[in-house]
UniProtKB/Swiss-Prot annotation:
The lineage of its organism: Eukaryota, Fungi, Dikarya, Ascomycota, Pezizomycotina. One of its GO terms (molecular function) is DNA-binding transcription factor activity, RNA polymerase II-specific. Transcription factor that probably regulates the gene clusters that mediates the biosynthesis of botcinin acid and its botcinin derivatives, acetate-derived polyketides that contribute to virulence when combined with the sesquiterpene botrydial. Botcinin acid and its derivatives have been shown to induce chlorosis and necrosis during host plant infection, but also have antifungal activities. It comes from Botryotinia fuckeliana (strain B05.10). GO terms for cellular component: nucleus. Residues 242-259 have a biased composition (Basic and acidic residues). It holds the Pfam family Zn_clus. This is C6 finger domain transcription factor BOA13. The gene is BOA13. Residues 260-274 have a biased composition (Polar residues).
Length: 568
């Protein structure tokens, strides 16, 4: 009795995929390509390990080459049956004849074909006894080509990269970017999620956070699909609402208005008056004309526009810088007259704003003047004098532009200030000695600064050692640096020089005298114009106005004496 015939081994790819030379999915009920193209899916018997042609068939079966195709037709519309119900149909005509052509075996299920290596070859049946060692190509059970790798080469299908979503969930997952984070993770407290107002939580789960969400990875979560949130999670605590913005804007506007109305003077750099007074007190008294009248402007330091050390100027500027008055103990020239200006601190904020708008440019000019004149890098006399001339010109031009066309020359400071600021004096406050004198004091301090700086220049010029200016000795003026100069200036004003070109010392003295006299004349004319514009008629001079005029007259007298001294 012959052993039962084993089912034949079929190809891994169907005929259509094999002809097109594309990868076949390998479903015995019909591959995906044939199902998609609505083609008939047929699988031929595998010829692996067999010699194709009539010689092998003649050697094995002893018959002529068979006619007909060795194929297995599979209808995709047939019903799928289980492995146990898969029957091998034998040909009734040649049921007992093993030498006839192989029987066609229809396979209706993918599990109906065993992929064991023991069944990779088709045994010839009754001719097993005739097989010798020369028929070794028949047994390829251990060959890699004979192994059916259909179970290992499963193609990538849709349900593998869409995880374990249902049909509805898969569409939402592929079309939405807003995956909600796991319910047991609070994104407000978990640093693994971003600090954005809208947390979409599309993050890789790190290995260190296994205590909370180690089982939430899509690759490991098979049974429970990840929930999907169609709307991004919104955290109201991170979003600035309109009411918060409005409240902050209102608060900012209120603070800005308060700052502008009360603290605008903080824009200017301030230096402690006490510290500044100590730094220049020893240096000022080294000059013949640096007496108490020179103390009024000594507080302007290298670009700084801090107020004067005088008590009178300090009280006039106290409404601008809002700092405590700490200079009452300083012994200066105007201490005895400071009680006349006590009422100037009772001005309103409106007057302060207008006066600051009027005097801000003056402080800028004075700051620039002080920075250039006291800078040790200014080694040329022409640079210093040009700076002074431009400062005086700007002050005079600004003063002329502020006066109205219908303003008389005898206009009082109160009327002039009201016309300029376009604000009429209030009846409820005393404007006779208020901040109306602030512009006048600023102009006076600017001219006082220029006067004293020229006084220093004249002192250096007149007290210069004639032995160092002999014809046999090179003049220190022609030296570009001040390191070789025999005379050091502790105040900061450099040794005067006409530049790098050489000039005779006699010509230097003559040019020096002419330039100084001309510039001092400009200062004198500007000071006279200021006094005539601001001050009233001599018969109507009040006590405080008389003090201002007295200071102007002192400056003019000093300028006239300096002009006489520098003339040769």
């Amino acid at each position: 009795m012959s052993p039962p015939q084993k089912p034949p081994k079929l190809r891994h790819a169907c005929n259509e995929c094999h002809a097109s030379k594309v990868r076949c999915s390998g479903e015995r009920t019909g591959c995906r390509r044939c199902v998609y193209n609505q083609q008939k899916c047929t699988y031929s018997v595998s010829m692996v390990g067999k010699v194709q042609g009539h010689r092998r068939r003649a050697a094995v079966t002893g018959t002529a080459p068979r006619s007909g195709a060795q194929s297995l037709n599979i209808n995709t519309s047939t019903e799928i049956i289980s492995v146990a119900n898969a029957d091998v149909i034998h040909d009734e005509a040649n049921g007992n004849d093993l030498n006839s052509k192989p029987n066609d075996v229809p396979v209706e299920s993918s599990e109906g074909i065993t992929s064991s290596p023991a069944h990779c070859s088709i045994l010839p049946g009754g001719n097993n006894g005739k097989v010798t060692t020369s028929s070794a190509p028949e047994n390829f059970s251990t060959s890699l080509e004979s192994i059916d790798t259909s179970s290992l080469e499963t193609p990538i299908i849709e349900h593998e990269f869409s995880w374990d979503f249902s049909s509805d969930e898969r569409a939402d997952a592929l079309n939405s970017l807003a995956l909600e984070n796991p319910s047991n993770v609070d994104s407000m407290k978990n640093p693994e999620y971003g600090d954005f107002e809208y947390d979409f939580s599309i993050h890789e789960v790190p290995a260190t956070s296994s205590s909370q969400d180690d089982s939430r990875s899509p690759k490991r979560q098979i049974a429970d699909p990840i929930p999907i949130s169609p709307v991004p999670k919104f955290y109201p605590s991170r979003k600035r609402t309109h009411s918060d913005l409005s409240e902050k804007q209102a608060q900012h506007a209120q603070n800005d208005l308060r700052w502008r109305s009360q603290s605008q003077s903080y824009k200017r750099p301030t230096i402690s008056t006490q510290h500044h007074n100590h730094s220049f007190s020893r240096e000022m008294y080294e000059y013949p004309e640096s007496s108490a009248s020179f103390d009024a402007d000594c507080s302007f330091d290298r670009g700084s526009t801090s107020h004067s050390t005088t008590s009178q100027t300090n009280m006039n500027h106290q409404s601008m810088n809002r700092i405590p008055q700490t200079t009452q103990s300083n012994r200066i020239s105007f201490t005895a007259q400071s009680h006349y200006m006590v009422s100037s601190m009772s001005s309103s904020v409106t007057h302060y704003e207008a006066s600051w708008r009027f005097t801000s440019k003056c402080f800028i000019i004075i700051s620039k003047l002080q920075k250039l004149l006291r800078d040790s890098s200014s080694l040329s006399l022409d640079v210093i004098l040009a700076t002074n001339k431009s400062a005086i010109s700007e002050l005079a031009q600004m003063f002329d532009s502020t006066l109205a066309s219908n303003t008389a020359r005898s206009t009082s400071p109160e009327d002039f200030f009201s016309i300029h600021s376009e604000i009429q004096p209030s009846n409820t406050c005393d404007t006779s000695l208020s901040t109306d004198f602030i512009p006048l004091m600023v102009y006076m301090i600017a001219l006082k600064c220029i006067h004293d700086l020229y006084s220093q220049a004249c002192f250096i010029f007149t007290q210069d050692d004639h032995r160092s200016r002999s014809l046999s000795t090179p003049s220190p003026r022609n030296t570009p640096s001040t390191s070789n100069s025999p005379f050091s200036n502790p105040f900061g004003l450099p040794q005067l020089d006409f530049g790098t070109f050489k000039i005779d010392i006699a010509d230097q003295r003559r040019l020096f005298s002419e330039i100084i006299a001309r510039e001092l004349g400009n200062c004198l004319s500007a000071c006279t114009r200021l006094r005539s514009y601001f001050l009233m008629q001599p018969g109507d001079i009040s006590t405080s106005t008389g003090l201002i005029e007295e200071m102007f007259l002192g400056i003019e007298e000093g300028l006239q004496s300096m002009i006489k001294r520098v003339k040769i």
